[in-house]
C-alpha cells in the first residue's frame, strides 16, 4: 500500500477526482495549500498563481502505478506547471477490514515489494509565517520548491519544554520532495538556519518515496 500525495492547480481538481473514482481509490482527501516556487521559477514554468490543492489518497502497488500513469496522460503531470505527485509506502494498517477496504479486498499484507527510493519527502513543521525562512534554507542546499499546509500544533506541554519551543500555535507544514542524494544537505540546512533554536522553530524529518510523477523536469540529462 502507498499513501499518495498529489499537488495540482485548482482547475484540475475535478479531473483528479474523476481519476480516483474510475480507479476506485478510497480515502481521498483534498486540502487547500500553496506552492513556494519563487517568482522567477513560476515565470519559467508558466505558473500564474501559487494556489494549490493537495489530494491525499491510499492505493495498492498496481493502482499506484496506474494512477501515476493517468496523471501523466490526463493532467499532463510531468509538463512544467501542471503539478507533482509522490507516494510513500505504508508499513501497517490497523484492522483487517480496513486493510481489505484499502487494498482491493486483500488482507494479506505479508508481501513487501522492492522499492527504489530515488526520492525522499522532507517534512518541516515551522511556526506560522516562517515558510520563507525554511524554504530559503532548503533552496540554499538545492531544493527546487515545496508545498505549504497550514495547521495548528497539538503537542503536550512536556514536549514543548523538551524542544524549547511552543508547539500549540499556528503552524506551517512544508512538504519538499528531493533526490535522496540531496536530502541530508537540505535537512541540515533547515536545521541550521530555521531549526528549533531559531524563530522559525522548525522540526524536520524525512520519509522514503516509492513513486513520483512530475519531477522529470529536474532530472539531469
Predicted region positions:
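Positively charged, small/polar-rich N-terminal and surface patches that mediate targeting and assembly
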Residues: 1-221
Amino acid at each position: 500500500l502507498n499513501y499518495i500525495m498529489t499537488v495540482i492547480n485548482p482547475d484540475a481538481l475535478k479531473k483528479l477526482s474523476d481519476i480516483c473514482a474510475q480507479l476506485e481509490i478510497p480515502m481521498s482527501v483534498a486540502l487547500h495549500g500553496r506552492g513556494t516556487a519563487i517568482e522567477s521559477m513560476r515565470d519559467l514554468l508558466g505558473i500564474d498563481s501559487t494556489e494549490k490543492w493537495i489530494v491525499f489518497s491510499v492505493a495498492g502497488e498496481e493502482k499506484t502505478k496506474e494512477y501515476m500513469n493517468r496523471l501523466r496522460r490526463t493532467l499532463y503531470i510531468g509538463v512544467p506547471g501542471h503539478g507533482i505527485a509522490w507516494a510513500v509506502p505504508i508499513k501497517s494498517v490497523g484492522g483487517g477490514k480496513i486493510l481489505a477496504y484499502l487494498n482491493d479486498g486483500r488482507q494479506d499484507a505479508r508481501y513487501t515489494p522492492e522499492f527504489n527510493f530515488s526520492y525522499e519527502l522532507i517534512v518541516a513543521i515551522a511556526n506560522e509565517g516562517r515558510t520563507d525562512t525554511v524554504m530559503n534554507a532548503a533552496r540554499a542546499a538545492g531544493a527546487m520548491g515545496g508545498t505549504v499546509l497550514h495547521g495548528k500544533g497539538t503537542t503536550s506541554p512536556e514536549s514543548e519544554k523538551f524542544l524549547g519551543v511552543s508547539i500549540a500555535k499556528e503552524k506551517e507544514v512544508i512538504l519538499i520532495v528531493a533526490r535522496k542524494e540531496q536530502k541530508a544537505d537540505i535537512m541540515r540546512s533547515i536545521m541550521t538556519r530555521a531549526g528549533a533554536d531559531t524563530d522559525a522553530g522548525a522540526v524536520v524529518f524525512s520519509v522514503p518515496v516509492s513513486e513520483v510523477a512530475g519531477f522529470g523536469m529536474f532530472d539531469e540529462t
